[in-house]
Amino acid sequence: MKDFVLLNDKILPNDVKCYSCCTTMDLIALVTKDDQIVIHRFLTWQKLFTINHMSTTINDNNTNNNNNNNNNNNNNNNDNNNDNDKSNKSIVSIQWSPNGKMISIGCEDGSIFIYNIENAKLINKSHNHKHPIHKLAWIKEVSQQRSQQQQQQQQQQQQQQQQQQQQQQQQQQQQQQQQQQQQQQNKNGSTKCNNNYVSPPLFLSQIKQNMNLFPSISYYFENSKEENIYLGGDIYDRPFDILICCDSIGVISLLAFGLFKIVTIDLLSLLKQKYSNTHFLIKPSKSLKILDITLTESLNKLSVMIETDNGLFLSVTIDTSILLEKRNEIHEISLQYFLLFQLQQSLDIHIKEITEKWKETQQQLSTKWVEFEKVLSDYGFSSSIEQELIDLLMCGVPSPPTNQFIVNNINIKKLKLTESNCNSIREILIKYILPSFLNIFHIITVLHNNSLENDGYKGLLDTNTVKNILDYCGSFGMRLQSLETLICGIESHYTSFFSWLYKVQCTLNEIQPDRKLSLPFNELSIMSLLKKGLKFDLLFSTSTLFSSSSSSSPSSPPSNNNSPTFSSSSSINNNNNNNNNELNQSGNIGFSNNNENLEFQYKDLKGNFHDLFKDFSSKIFETFNEITIVLPSLFKFENVIPFCLYDKNDTSVSHKFNCSLISHPNDTIYLSIYTTLSNSNRLFICKREDKLNWSFTCYQLNEKYSILDCKFYNNSSLMALVSEDIIKANQKKSTRKNTYLKQYQYKTDDNDDSDNREYIKLDVNIPQSTILLDLLDSFKSREIILKSRISPITFELSTSRKISATFIGKRRVALYDLAEDEEEEEEGEEEDICLVR
């Protein structure tokens, strides 16, 4: 019996709650007690970096609070909110992506966070569950035809090598012919694969081309310093994969690339609706726990092993072939969603930026106008600052307080900063905001065209919904485009106003004006600005930009009851008819003419700019609601098998039940179960080959052995942690236990689907007495004898790297190399390193 090679045995400084081994790279992720994610290398135990998850969630929560409160100073409960977030967002599960470049974590509050391993950035967060995320699994799609072609190519290569040995004289000629044959085979194989595999479809290159339609947004993605936007282009090149998330009550969600939710399954409610007659314990069960779950690499079958709260163990197999049938469409929609999400983030960031710049400008001006009001109050004047300046503009002679304010309180260079801020806002709008919107509009248009022209998108995209969203985006886009003209008008009005103030100041002070500061001004523009009000928000006010001239159309979105309501443009025109006429003549701040020409597009938009943008940000993602409704309805239950049950109220007996699932390329599913519930110490291997039947074989364990944990290692063997009771001659109970990491073979050949073991049909549950088919024995193991009785002992596998990470307690980790030795060892030569438990 061969030993596993011990690579590292480390004592960690902090307790570890959960951990995960990367399947493709030499990495292990550890989640500490304080919810920090520490990334180490296997071999050297080099610490690469640490992701502080709690700081990410708190910063994100504070950002959301600031967005929701806007100008309100509601910061009294921030500390309490942060404490609640710390407890609610505590990490309970972790899983690597198939390519090893991302890592997903499930939290106590049901939220899921995706981090990029290359730069430790937060890629995405979602909150699709209301209960803790109990288990995560990340599956990469592998086409059946592709795997068969690879096997055929391997066989052909072997035949070619034999021919080379037999015909050594013509070796050079044969090599040239073989190279040509291989090239043709590769071309033919790739051509066949392109018709059925997800990676090469044309829509991938089309999406990449669409990203470059507007160079400004491409420039932004390449030069952005914003840490919250994931710019990774690898998602457009990697194969299609699905993240499976399971919460503590049995709700399952499937996320394409870990980012886009495509399916949600309430397993318990579906079992009660369709399979309550299968077993008498299904109907009264109130919750269930998912023990293990797997999705076949062909995306055809979803197999779940569950335990109900009343002690029933079930195996559920679901037909998910619709994922295979519509995988290209789902793949494209997922990528469009991801690109749309990036663009929306970009739009949100720059809207916040121009809002902050405008608030800063308004605050500077408001401070100056408050000083003016104080001067008027000191002189006992009851007139407004606008009236004083209008009188000055009309008569040319200032009142005493106005004279004092202009002479002593105005710094024209500081006021000119308002113009530069307006110019900066306009630049951001042209460079980033409008291109982001145009890309979003283009994506919605592409999805709308697909829903009309391509039958494959039927059931995934609702044509009417996408059309309504497209119309809404057009209306919002026109409003957004008018914002650029509005900013130009505001800048022009303030330029005239400040130039006039500077001229008056120079006249009162009897000084020669500076030519750089002395610019021409328009008196009508100044008059319209003063009549509008110096404290009036010209940029984000409802009455100036986003007033609706009529009631909303039937196709308009439902209004938000919590958002403030505003007067229509008709009422504003009635109250300020003269003002609006002057505004339109001097700079068209109000855009009444544009509103009249585009009235049909504006009917469904109400509220101020921020309310509209918030509604727009949520509405564009309603495009993808149909896919999450239709796909789950097309899933079909193939079978529900009750395996065994136990009395949870009977605490006198400690029952054990461990299980593991694995799917083979031909959609065969294997299930390993270790249980003491059948009054026997056995390991059952169950095989599912068709829709209706499971068959099984079992292995008898010695009475002193018990399996602590088991996992499938590959398509022919499984790994298990086996505990052995050590009972001395003068004792009845064991005082010490030895723990082994063992590898068992459940299938004869990894590349051969045939199996010489006898499998018996599994009817209702595991029989109490079964014919002994084989004696359980491992062909490779490692004995771990602990110095003290530390528990629990768990392990995780990295199948591609052939590494096992065994955790002993909460702070000790032992890494073992599971690779086969090249040299055979003689039987009986075992040098097990013993650690006493």
UniProtKB/Swiss-Prot annotation:
Biased composition (Low complexity): 59-81, 547-581
Main location: nucleus
One GO cellular component term noted in the UniProt record for this chain: nuclear periphery
Keywords, comma-separated and alphabetical: Cell cycle, Cell division, Mitosis, Nucleus, Ubl conjugation pathway
A Pfam entry, by short name: ANAPC4_WD40
Quaternary structure and interacting proteins, as annotated: The APC/C is composed of at least 13 subunits that stay tightly associated throughout the cell cycle: anapc1, anapc2, anapc3, anapc4, anapc5, anapc6, anapc7, anapc8, anapc10, anapc11, cdc20, cdc26 and cdh1.
Its biological purpose: Component of the anaphase promoting complex/cyclosome (APC/C), a cell cycle-regulated E3 ubiquitin-protein ligase complex that controls progression through mitosis and the G1 phase of the cell cycle.
The family this protein is said to belong to: Belongs to the APC4 family.
Protein name: Anaphase-promoting complex subunit 4
Protein species of origin: Dictyostelium discoideum (Social amoeba)
Classification lineage: Eukaryota, Amoebozoa, Evosea, Eumycetozoa, Dictyostelia
